[in-house]
């Protein structure tokens, strides 16, 4: 299957050539899905399968790039720029329907809900509602099957899952506020950026000298609760840690320290899968208390310890077999990541201990060929936390910042995993 990544594959200005290229790539994509027994895309399916296969992912990324090129070519440069740079209103409209609870007012199923019913339930202006719903349905959020008659589709049904609703609501509210202050935050640093998590677009947007996490969990608790629930919603897009690294290969009784492990969900999952391992979940005390309040399954309770710990301080657990960092380092700048890793390195036992970094490795494609999802997530990390998503080269740079003895031994992923699949970087200390 051809998955060419050179500029010529997507930069044509010939409309017919572009259409033929899209058609052939779709054929290759569907053929690959059929070959691996995966579901074909269907917007009416609210729970689509996450495809990890490299060939399918490469074809999918190419289709997305080609379709973007097609839309730009048909619209023309000026209209394309206007459409792209007014897209913030799409997010604003989705945020509005979530705030009004329209996703709950429109009943699941084939029977439509009228605009008048939505007006009655919300008390909102019919004129404004109609204009908001027009934008949403055009962006495939709900279907308007007759004038002012709306039903759910596979996209809008996602909002009925509270974690997904919280994730999208956070993006449409907090995310838009951060985006509005993005350039101002960079101007403050003369466009050089900052390592300080309190000197961000987020801090400008909320007029605070606190970082995102501190603000959400100490000042605006309602936003903090939504954010925490939304982060749980983001889990549906992530590859399971235990599906990438063979924890069963660790020695019987091995100790895994889940650094910044939140409520302990990942440790519980791995403990249930691999009976011979012991876990220490480290995080803020309030986070750990929330995890314990939710309850730990009886079958693994004796093998999971909860330990309050700030990973910017000395690591108290010495010589563990594994120090796991799952989606921690992308929240931080290189200098802060180096501090986190250095504290772990000081606790490691050469020849025994390893660090497992469960985090994204951004593909090193040319800009036009790269993943838009990773690009936007990277800038979200910058705007909110002064963090970043990293390429393999950037990961290696960070590792060398920590210690010349710290080496990347292996990158783990699911079998045949592609550029958008999860990855685990295994780090060891040279003796």
UniProtKB/Swiss-Prot annotation:
Keyword Transferase in record: yes
Pfam families, per database record: Dimerisation, Methyltransf_2
Pathway stated in the Swiss-Prot or TrEMBL entry: Secondary metabolite biosynthesis
PROSITE patterns: SAM_OMT_II (PS51683)
GO molecular function terms listed in the Swiss-Prot or TrEMBL record: O-methyltransferase activity; protein dimerization activity
Functional note: O-methyltransferase; part of the gene cluster that mediates the biosynthesis of the isocyanide xanthocillin and its derivatives. The first step of the pathway consists in the conversion of tyrosine into a vinyl-isonitrile intermediate by the isocyanide synthase xanB. Subsequent oxidative dimerization of this intermediate to form xanthocillin may involve the cytochrome P450 monooxygenase xanG, whose expression is coregulated with that of XanB.
Entry protein name: O-methyltransferase xanE
Protein species of origin: Aspergillus fumigatus (strain ATCC MYA-4609 / CBS 101355 / FGSC A1100 / Af293) (Neosartorya fumigata)
